[in-house]
Structures are given as C-alpha cells and as structure tokens.
Amino acid sequence: GSYDAMPKGDFEGLSSLKLKDDAVLEVTMSDPQSYYLRGYTGSVYNKHGWETTDKKVLYNASDLFYWLHQDGFFGQETLPLASLALDETTKEEPENTVTIKNLKEDSRYLYTPYELTGTTPDKNRIGDEGVIAKGLKGQRKYTYTALENQIKKYPSLTAKLADTENLDEEGKAYSEKEAFYNQYVYETNLELPESVETELKEILGEYTLANGSTHFDYTKAKQNILYVLSSRCTYSEGIKKETGDLDFLTN
C-alpha cells in the first residue's frame, strides 16, 4: 500500500504517487468480502484540499445533530440505516465482524466501511465527519461490526427512498431524518470555490432545479460527473506541484 500520498486532505506539496510493498492495515473479517474503508474524511473543499467545517457553522447545526443523534441517526451510518429501513432482506443478513490492525496509517481515525454498524459515533460531535478514534494517541487495533456489502444496493435504495408514497412507517421515519441531514450536507459540504464553479459551468452549462426539488437530479448528476471525468480528465500518478494561488482541481 501507499501511506504518504494523500496527507489528510492537504494537497499543497503533494508528491507523485509511489506505491510501496509495506502493509498499511491488516484487516480480518468473519465473512471476508469487499469494502471501501474510510479514514480521514474532509468536509469542505478549498483551493488546496479539504478542511473541517467552520466552527460557527457547526454551532448553528448543534440542535439538528442533537435531535438526529438522540434518534439514532448518524451521518457515518446512513447506508446501513437506509438499507435496514428500506430493504426487509437486509435484516436477515448476518453481520460481519471486522478487526483492523493499523500498522502505519494515522491512528487518530478509525478505518471503517460505509456499512458500519458496530461502533456508535460520538453523540456530542457535530457534523458527523468520519469516525474519530479514542485516546490521545488514537487506536492501533479495534473491532466493529458491519452489514454485508451494501454499495451494490445503492441504486435500489435510492429508488425506494424517492418513492415516498409507498414507504412504510420505518421508511418514512428514516426519510424524515435523512432529509434534514441531506439539507445540511448540501448547504455545508458541497460548496465549491468560484474558480471550479466557473469551469464546470463552461463544460456543462447552467442548470435549473425542477419544481419542488431541493437538488439536481441524481441520475443526471452522475451522468455529468462521468462525462467530465471521461472527457476532461486524464489519469496520472504524477502530480504537477501547485504554484501561487492556483486551484488544485483546475490546475
């Protein structure tokens, strides 16, 4: 693995990717399968990387997150919560016990999948940005439980969530909480620097929201993302270092 290519969201001084043979994490599971593990999670993109949400913004959202957390809703667990509320078959699936031994990565963060269920995040932490390890030095070894891989269910779950007329009581309860969290994410975590917005408008043009919608259609948004990646981006493990006040995305 490589353990120095992405220094916690800071793109300034970022070097080219050089993969190493050293193990970074040791992962064991009761039911081995594929997961995407998250460690450091940035919240707001600036020209030079990711940063945490402004304290004033978090303070203003404190009542919202108090209510969500008291009701068992955490942003780090939206996928398993959605699957359990919207798909009856999920409740019949066995949970997977996962043990992480952190050999060389930052021990301040727990490395967890989107399907995380066995580690209750801090109820007093506003913003739900990743899962922070306990202790001054973090944690090098820990165990949690997770649902089976749920990423593959994402299209069907979003379709069920959108079909509001056919949601049962459990689905409606999840939908209500998700809507409040969704609004916070859109207002807080999806802001882009003006330079990026300008370039994207040149590529994709202007857009308008459909009547009654609070955000752009997910299917069309995905198509736009794939279009930009395939037509305007070239994969490279070499990094051109930033100079001056250039934006990492547009440089």
Where are the regions that the model predicts?
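Helix-boundary/low-complexity linker signature
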Residues: 1-251
